[in-house]
Curated annotation (Swiss-Prot):
Keywords: ATP-binding, Bromodomain, Nucleotide-binding, Transcription. GO terms for molecular function: ATP binding; ATP hydrolysis activity; chromatin binding; histone binding. SUPFAM superfamilies: Bromodomain, P-loop containing nucleoside triphosphate hydrolases. Transmembrane segments: none annotated. Changing residue 1001 to E: In gu48; reduced lin-48 expression in hindgut cells. This is Tat-binding homolog 7. Belongs to the AAA ATPase family.
Length: 1291
C-alpha cells in the first residue's frame, strides 16, 4: 500500500528500543500483552548468534537495522493464548476490532498503577544503573500531545510533584549532557535489578510511561495489522508470494511442537520516528486508503507511465524500490505524444482509403515482412488535386514521354526487361528555374498512376520532412520511407527540393547532413535491391546536389525544365483558358499575349490569367467593390480582352527579371520603331537557323505518331557562333547592351542562357568557381541542343574580373569545336576600332555587328508616336455605362456560401435534431404543468359549440392547450416564438370573446390574464435565451450550406446574412429582429446607390453648362435669376422640390479632375423645372444618360456638357519637326529620355479641354534639352543654349 510519509505503518506504531527494553526488564510475563509474537511464530530461539524473526515471521539475520546482540524476554502460555485470540480477531471487521480495542483499553484502566518504592543501590550497582540509563537515553525522545497528557496523568496518580527529581531523572539529565561526548553503545536488556537485601524490582518512570502507552499501541497496532492484511491481499492478486513466507508457514507446525520453555526474542535497533496523535493517525489512514483505492483503479496508467512503488513487508525503515522497466518512448521522447499508429505511417498520396483497403491483405503481408510502418513520420499525406493530369501540362511533351519510360513501361511490359537482362531507370531528377512545372508534373504523374488496373503508390516528401534534431532519426525516417514504398511496390518516391536533403558533402558541412546523404545513397543503390521503387527529385539548383547522386543507378536521367518558348506559352494559355467557354479571348489575342510574355514561366502565365479575369470583373461590375452584400452578376457579360491582359502584365514581374541574371526583355511598341528592323535583320541574317527555332523532330512532326517515331533522330547540326554587338564611330552607344541584347534574348527564349556577367560571377566572392560552374553547365546543355553563353559589356568586364578568369575564358573558347552548338553573344560599348586588345583576340572583325544612329524617317515616326497622345480627349466618367446589379441574397439559383464536408454536415444535422428535441420536451413539460393547473381548466379543451354558439364565428383562429400539445407531438414548432404566440393567442381569444360586463366573462378574462402572467414567468425564468439563439445559429448554418433536414424543419424565415444584435426574449422575438435588420439593410443599400450615382425614384437631375468658363470673378444666372458660382469647370445641378443632393453622388458624376475645390460654392436651385423651350443655346451638346438598370427601375436623365478639344495642329507639326532636327545623331537612350519627359508633360494635360499652350511648352522643352555629350551650355548643332538659367533636360 502506498504511504505518504515514507515510513512503514508498523514503524509508526512502535516505540524506541529503549522503551521496549525497560518494559521487558520491569514487567511480568502477563504484562507483555500481544506486543511480540509467540513461539509458534518463531523458527528457533536464535539467542546466541543473534538470528531472530519479527512478529510476522520474517527472518531478521544480517539486517543493518538489527543489532547482533539481543534482549531476552520470557514468553508464557498466556502469551500464546493472547496471540491466538488476536489472530482470530483478524476475521472481524474494522469496526468490531476498534470496539474490541476500546473495551480492552477500558479494562486496562481499571488495573491499579504500580507503586513506586525508594531503593538504595551500592556504588557498583549505581554505576551499572547509570551506565544502562545513559545507553537507554542515547536515542532522543520526542513527546507528543498524547504521550504528554498520559505521562502527566500518571504523575498525578502517583503523587509525584513536578519540582521533585528522582535519582533516575538526574541520571538521565546527566546522560543527555554527555551523550554527544561518549560513543553510542548497543542497547542491551539486563535482568531485573534486585535490591540489596532481596527487595522488590525497581521500576523507573520511563518504564511506567511505556506501560501507560501500551493500550494506545494496541488500538493503533490493530489498524496497522489491517493495513498489512490489505497489502497481503494486493500481493495475492498480483500472483506473487514471498518464498520466505512460504518457508515460515511450513515451519509453523514444527514451532508449535516445541516446548513451552522461556523463549528469547531478538530485538533490533530502530531509528526514531515522528509520532502523531490519534486524530492525525486516522486522517493519514483515510488518506492512504483513498490513495490506495485510486491507485487500484488507475493501475494500468501507473504501470505505463513508469515504475510503481510497491508496499514493503519488511520491518526496515527503507522501502523496497523496483527499478523501472525500460520504455521505448523514453528512448524516443519526440515520439511520446504521437497520434494514432495509422497516422504515423508513410501512406501514398494518390490512393484513397477504399483503394488501400481493397489490397489490405497484400500490403499487410508485405509490411509484416519488411517491418515497415512502425512509428514512422508524423506527417499527414498531402492532398493532391485529382483533376491534374498529363493533359493539363503544356510544352513538356518530352518530359512526359521520359517519365512513361521510367514508370509505366517496366510495369506494363516486364518481359522486355527480363529478355535483355536489364534494369529499367529508377531515378529521375527535375531541375530548372522556379515555376517551370516540376511539381506540376509530379502531381500529374501521381494522378496518372491512379488510373488503370495497375495502380502505383506515390509518396511525396519535402526535403525538410525527413530532417530531425534527434541523432539518427532522419536516417530512420528515410529507411522507413523506403521500406514502406518497397512494401507497396510498385511505387514512386518524390522528393521536392531535394537539395535541402542531400547537398554537396564537404569538410565544412555538418556531419549530420553527410550521414543523411550517405544513407540516401545506400538506399537508392546499395547492397539491397530497391525493387520496383522509382525515386524522383526536384531542385532549383542542380549544382548543389551531391555528385554521387547524379550517376546511373541512382538518378539515371536529368530533365531540365526551362522557361517556355513561344509554342509552349501558347499551349499553357490554351490550357488555362480552355474552360472560359464564351468568355475566352479570341485566338489572335492569345497569340499576341504569347509573343509579349517572353521570359514568363508557367506559374507566371497562370497568374496572368487570374489577374486578367479580376481586372475584367472590376471593369464590368465595379459595384461589388463598394458593397459588402452579394449582388446578382451576369458572368456571361464579362469579356476578357487584350487590354485586361495588358493591365495584368504591369502587375507581374516575370521569372526572367526576378533574378536579374538574364536581361531578357522584348521591345515595346515605342522602341520597336527604332530597333525593330535592326533586331529582325540581325536574327535572320547573322544567327543560324538552328538557334532561331527548334528544328527537332517533335517540333516539325505533323502527328503524335510521327513525333514518337522521329524523337530518336539526332538534332540538326548547329555551328558555333560568336557575335559582338558594338557601336559605330559616330555613335558609341547604339543601344546594343540596354535594348538590342535583351530583345535578341527575348526572341531566342527557347534556348537555355548562361550568363558570364559581372553580377553573376562576383555574387559569392569566388569568380573562378562561378565561372567554371557556368561553363560546365553550358557544355552539358550543348550536348542536348543549342544554347547561349552571354557576356554583356565586355570592355567593362575585363576591368573588373581577375586576369585568371580572363585566361579561363580564352581557354574555354579555344577548346570549343566548330560543331559545339553554343552562341557566344557579347556587347561592346564602343566601336570595334577602339576596342581593347583582349576583345580583338576573342572576336574577329567578321563577328562584329555595328549599330548606326537612327535615320530621320525613323525618328519622325518615333516622335509622332510619342506626341500622338496630345490629341486624345479627356475621359468623361459616365455611370450609366456600368449597370447596377441587384442583390442576390434570396435568389434560388445562388450557390451555398458555406461548404461543409460529410462529417460536418452529419454533426450539424445531429446537433439541430437534438436541439429541437430538447425544445419540444421543455415545452411539453411546461404545457403539462399549465394543463394540470385548475385555474386554467377552461383553456385545456376546445370550446363547446353548444355552450357558445357564435364562438367560432367571432374567433377566427380558435386554439386550446390540447391543440398546442398536438402540434408539439407533430413537431410543428421549430422556434420558441411560435409556441409562445399560440399560448398568447389563447389569452387574446378569451379577451376578445368574453365581455367584461358579465360575471362569467370577468372570471374568464381574469383566468386569461393569469395565464399570460404564468406564461411570461415560465418563459422568461426557465427558458435559456442562449438555447434559442443556438437553434437559430445552427439553422442558419444549415441554410448557408444548402442542407435540408428530413425530420425537423429549418427556420426558413431567417434571411441569408442575418445576425442578431440583441439577445432573444419574449419582447425581442425573431420576427422583430429580422424586421429591424431588413430596415437597416435597406438603408445601407440606399446609401450604396447614392455612392454609385443612382438617384432615388423621384429624383431628376439636369446639368446646365456654365456660360463663361474663363472668367475669374463672373457669375452665371439661372432662368429664375438665382446666382450660381462660376468656378473652373463647375456644373449646376437642379432638383425637384423636397429632394436634397448628396455630395457623394455629385462627385461621382463629375470627372476626377473637374471636381470643385469647395462643394459649398455650388448653388443648388430648387423648385425649378427646365422645359425644352427653356434650354440654353449649348443644350445641343448635352448627353442624356441611359437607364440605370434594364429592369423596371426608374429612369434618371442626366445631361453632361460635352466640349470640344482645342489643340493647334500646326503647332504640333512644328513640335515634331523640332524634335527630329534636335535628335540628329542621338543614341537610343537619349531619345528615350526625351520621350519620357514629353510624355509626362502631356499626361499633365490629359484632363484639359483647352490645350493651345501645350505644343509651345513641349517645343521649349526640346529646344532647351541638353544631351549627355553637351558641356559648357552647347548642344549638338553648335548653337548656344539661350536658357542658361534653366535646368537641363526639363528637370
Amino acid at each position: 500500500m502506498p504511504r505518504s510519509d515514507g515510513f512503514s505503518p508498523r514503524k509508526n506504531l512502535r516505540r524506541s528500543a529503549r522503551d521496549h527494553s525497560r518494559s521487558y526488564a520491569g514487567q511480568c510475563n502477563e504484562d507483555f500483552d500481544d506486543m511480540y509474537a509467540p513461539s509458534s511464530r518463531r523458527r528457533s530461539s536464535g539467542g546466541v548468534d543473534g538470528n531472530g524473526y519479527t512478529r510476522s515471521g520474517r527472518k531478521i539475520n544480517h539486517n543493518r537495522y538489527y543489532e547482533e546482540e539481543y534482549h531476552e524476554a520470557i514468553s508464557s502460555e498466556e502469551d500464546e493464548r493472547r496471540y491466538r485470540t488476536r489472530r482470530s480477531s483478524n476475521s472481524m471487521t474494522y469496526r468490531q476490532q476498534v470496539m474490541q480495542a476500546i473495551d480492552e483499553s477500558k479494562r486496562n484502566q481499571k488495573v491499579p498503577p504500580a507503586k513506586r518504592k525508594r531503593i538504595y543501590l551500592s556504588d557498583e550497582e549505581e554505576e551499572d544503573f547509570a551506565e544502562a540509563a545513559h545507553v537507554e537515553n542515547t536515542v532522543p525522545e520526542r513527546a507528543t500531545r498524547r504521550s504528554t497528557r498520559r505521562r502527566s496523568s500518571m504523575h498525578e496518580e502517583l503523587g509525584v510533584s513536578e519540582q521533585e527529581e528522582s535519582p533516575v531523572r538526574r541520571t538521565r539529565k546527566a546522560a543527555k549532557r554527555l551523550g554527544s561526548e561518549q560513543p553510542e553503545e548497543n542497547l542491551a536488556a539486563d535482568d531485573p535489578l534486585p535490591m540489596e537485601g532481596g527487595g522488590e524490582i525497581v521500576l523507573p518512570i520511563a518504564e511506567i510511561d511505556g506501560m501507560a502507552e501500551q493500550e494506545n499501541e494496541d488500538l493503533i497496532e490493530k489498524i496497522g495489522r489491517e493495513e498489512e492484511e490489505e497489502g497481503a491481499e494486493e500481493d495475492e492478486q498480483s500472483g506473487e508470494k514471498d518464498p520466505e513466507e512460504e518457508e515460515d508457514d511450513s515451519s509453523n507446525a514444527e514451532s508449535s511442537e516445541e516446548s513451552t520453555a522461556p523463549r528469547q526474542y531478538s530485538l533490533r535497533r530502530r531509528q526514531p520516528v515522528v509520532q502523531f496523535n490519534a486524530s492525525e493517525a486516522r486522517e493519514n489512514r483515510r488518506a492512504r486508503l483513498e490513495h490506495h483505492r485510486v491507485a487500484n483503479q488507475n493501475r494500468h496508467h501507473r504501470n505505463r507511465n513508469g515504475s510503481r512503488r510497491r508496499r514493503s513487508d519488511s520491518d526496515s525503515d527503507s522501502d523496497d524500490m523496483v527499478l523501472p522497466r525500460p520504455d521505448k518512448r523514453q528512448s524516443r521522447p519526440h515520439m511520446h505524444n504521437r497520434g494514432e499508429r495509422e497516422r504515423g505511417r508513410f501512406m501514398p498520396i494518390n490512393m484513397t482509403e477504399k483503394e488501400l483497403q481493397s489490397a489490405q491483405h497484400i500490403l499487410m503481408d508485405r509490411m509484416r515482412k519488411t517491418d515497415a510502418g512502425q512509428g514512422a513520420s508524423d506527417i499527414d499525406p498531402m492532398s493532391v488535386d485529382s483533376s491534374v493530369g498529363f493533359d493539363q501540362v503544356g510544352g513538356l511533351g518530352h518530359h512526359i514521354q521520359s517519365l512513361k519510360e521510367v514508370v509505366l513501361f517496366p510495369m506494363l511490359y516486364p518481359e522486355v526487361f527480363e529478355k535483355f537482362r536489364i534494369n529499367p531507370p529508377k531515378g529521375v531528377v527535375f531541375y530548372g528555374p522556379p515555376g517551370t512545372g516540376k511539381t506540376l508534373v509530379a502531381r500529374a504523374l501521381a494522378n496518372e498512376c491512379r488510373r488503370g488496373a495497375n495502380k502505383v503508390a506515390f509518396f511525396m516528401r519535402k526535403g525538410a520532412d525527413c530532417l530531425s534534431k534527434w541523432v539518427g532519426e532522419s536516417e530512420r525516417q528515410l529507411r522507413l520511407l523506403f521500406d514502406q514504398a518497397y512494401a507497396m511496390r510498385p511505387s514512386i518516391i518524390f522528393f521536392d527540393e531535394i537539395d535541402g536533403l542531400a547537398p554537396v558533402r564537404s569538410s565544412k558541412q555538418d556531419q549530420i547532413h553527410a550521414s543523411i546523404v550517405s544513407t540516401l545513397l545506400a538506399l537508392m543503390d546499395g547492397l539491397d535491391g530497391r525493387g520496383e521503387v522509382v525515386v524522383i527529385g526536384a531542385t532549383n539548383r542542380l549544382d548543389t546536389l551531391d555528385p554521387a547522386l547524379r550517376r546511373p543507378g541512382r538518378f539515371d536521367r536529368e530533365l531540365r525544365f526551362s522557361l517556355p518558348d513561344l509554342n509552349a506559352r501558347r499551349q499553357i494559355l490554351d490550357i488555362h483558358t480552355s474552360k472560359w467557354e464564351e468568355n475566352k479571348p479570341i485566338p489572335e489575342t492569345l497569340d499576341a499575349i504569347a509573343e509579349r510574355t517572353s521570359g514568363y514561366c508557367g506559374a507566371d502565365l497562370k497568374f496572368l490569367c487570374t489577374e486578367a479575369v479580376l481586372i475584367g470583373l472590376r471593369s464590368r461590375y465595379p459595384h461589388i467593390y463598394m458593397c459588402s452584400e452579394r449582388l446578382k452578376l451576369d458572368v456571361a457579360t464579362i469579356k476578357i480582352t487584350s487590354e485586361h491582359f495588358g493591365h495584368a502584365m504591369r502587375r507581374i514581374t516575370p521569372a526572367s527579371r526576378r533574378d536579374l541574371t538574364i536581361p531578357s526583355r522584348p521591345l515595346d511598341e515605342r522602341t520597336s520603331i527604332l530597333l525593330g528592323d535592326t533586331v529582325s535583320n540581325l536574327i535572320s541574317l547573322r544567327i543560324p537557323q538552328g538557334y532561331r527555332c527548334v528544328e527537332n523532330a517533335m517540333a516539325t512532326a505533323s502527328s503524335e505518331l510521327e513525333q514518337v517515331v522521329r524523337a530518336l533522330e539526332p538534332n540538326p547540326t548547329v555551328p558555333a557562333i560568336r557575335l559582338l554587338l558594338c557601336g559605330s564611330e559616330q555613335l558609341a552607344d547604339g543601344g546594343q547592351t540596354s535594348y538590342v541584347l535583351p530583345a535578341i534574348l527575348a526572341k531566342l527564349d527557347h534556348l537555355p542562357v548562361f550568363s558570364l556577367s559581372v553580377s553573376s560571377l562576383l555574387t559569392d566572392g569566388r569568380p573562378e568557381e562561378a565561372f567554371s560552374n557556368a561553363i560546365q553547365s553550358a557544355m552539358r546543355a550543348s550536348a542536348t541542343g543549342p544554347c547561349i553563353m552571354l557576356l554583356p559589356s565586355i570592355d567593362e568586364w575585363i576591368k573588373v574580373i581577375p586576369v585568371s578568369v580572363q585566361h579561363m575564358l580564352i581557354t574555354c573558347l579555344e577548346s570549343m569545336t566548330g560543331f559545339t552548338p553554343i552562341l557566344f553573344l557579347s556587347t561592346l560599348d564602343t566601336s570595334f576600332e577602339d576596342a581593347p586588345e583582349y576583345v580583338t583576340e576573342i572576336f574577329r572583325h567578321a563577328n562584329c555587328i555595328t549599330l548606326n544612329p537612327s535615320r530621320r524617317t525613323i525618328r519622325q515616326k518615333y516622335f509622332e508616336h510619342v506626341i500622338e497622345k496630345i490629341n486624345t480627349p479627356p475621359k468623361v466618367f459616365d455611370p450609366t455605362v456600368y449597370e447596377m446589379p441587384l442583390p442576390d441574397d434570396d435568389s434560388p439559383d445562388s450557390k451555398p456560401s458555406r461548404k461543409l464536408n460529410d462529417d460536418e454536415t452529419r454533426e450539424l444535422l445531429k446537433m439541430y435534431t437534438a436541439l429541437q428535441r430538447q425544445m419540444r420536451l421543455f415545452f411539453k413539460e411546461r404545457l403539462t404543468r399549465l394543463m394540470r393547473d385548475r385555474r386554467f381548466v377552461e383553456f385545456v379543451e376546445p370550446v363547446d359549440p353548444d355552450e357558445a354558439e357564435d364562438y367560432y364565428e367571432i374567433i377566427e383562429t380558435p386554439i386550446c392547450m390540447q391543440d398546442i400539445m398536438e402540434k408539439l407531438n407533430n413537431c410543428e414548432y421549430n422556434h420558441a416564438d411560435k409556441f409562445v404566440a399560440d399560448l398568447i393567442l389563447i389569452q387574446t381569444n378569451a379577451l376578445e370573446y368574453n365581455p367584461s360586463t358579465t360575471k362569467d366573462g370577468k372570471l374568464i378574462r381574469q383566468m386569461a390574464n393569469t395565464l399570460r402572467d404564468a406564461i411570461d414567468d415560465l418563459i422568461e425564468c426557465e427558458l435559456d435565451e442562449s438555447f434559442v439563439e443556438r437553434i437559430e445559429t445552427v439553422s442558419r448554418m444549415l441554410q448557408d450550406a444548402g442542407v435540408t433536414p428530413t425530420s425537423d424543419k429549418l427556420l426558413t424565415e431567417i434571411p441569408k446574412g442575418f445576425a442578431r444584435k440583441k439577445a432573444w426574449s419574449m419582447t425581442n422575438s425573431l420576427a422583430k429582429e429580422i424586421e429591424q435588420w431588413t430596415s437597416e439593410r435597406e438603408a445601407e443599400n440606399q446609401k450604396m446607390l447614392s455612392k454609385l450615382g443612382v438617384a432615388a425614384p423621384t429624383l431628376e437631375l439636369v446639368v446646365v453648362p456654365v456660360e463663361d468658363m474663363k472668367s475669374e470673378e463672373g457669375t452665371s444666372t439661372s432662368t429664375d435669376g438665382v446666382p450660381a458660382s462660376a468656378g473652373n469647370k463647375k456644373k449646376l445641378l437642379k432638383k425637384k422640390k423636397g429632394q436634397k443632393k448628396s455630395k457623394t453622388g455629385e462627385s461621382e458624376e463629375h470627372d476626377e479632375d473637374s471636381t470643385v475645390e469647395d462643394a459649398g460654392e455650388d448653388t443648388i436651385v430648387e423648385n425649378l423645372e427646365i422645359k425644352k423651350n427653356q434650354e440654353t443655346p449649348n443644350s445641343e451638346h448635352d448627353i442624356e444618360m441611359k437607364d440605370a438598370s434594364k429592369d423596371s427601375t426608374p429612369s434618371v436623365q442626366i445631361s453632361i456638357a460635352e466640349k470640344e478639344l482645342i489643340v493647334s495642329k500646326p503647332a504640333t507639326c512644328e513640335l515634331i519637326q523640332c524634335c527630329v532636327e534636335k535628335s540628329e545623331g542621338w543614341s537610343v537612350s537619349e531619345l528615350e529620355r526625351l520621350s519620357s519627359v514629353l510624355s509626362h508633360t502631356i499626361e499633365r494635360f490629359r484632363d484639359e479641354w483647352n490645350r493651345e499652350n501645350l505644343p509651345a511648352q513641349l517645343t521649349q522643352i526640346v529646344r532647351e534639352w541638353q544631351t549627355a555629350d553637351d558641356s559648357n551650355n552647347t548642344i549638338v548643332n553648335g548653337t548656344l543654349n539661350k536658357s542658361n538659367g534653366n535646368l537641363a533636360n526639363g528637370h
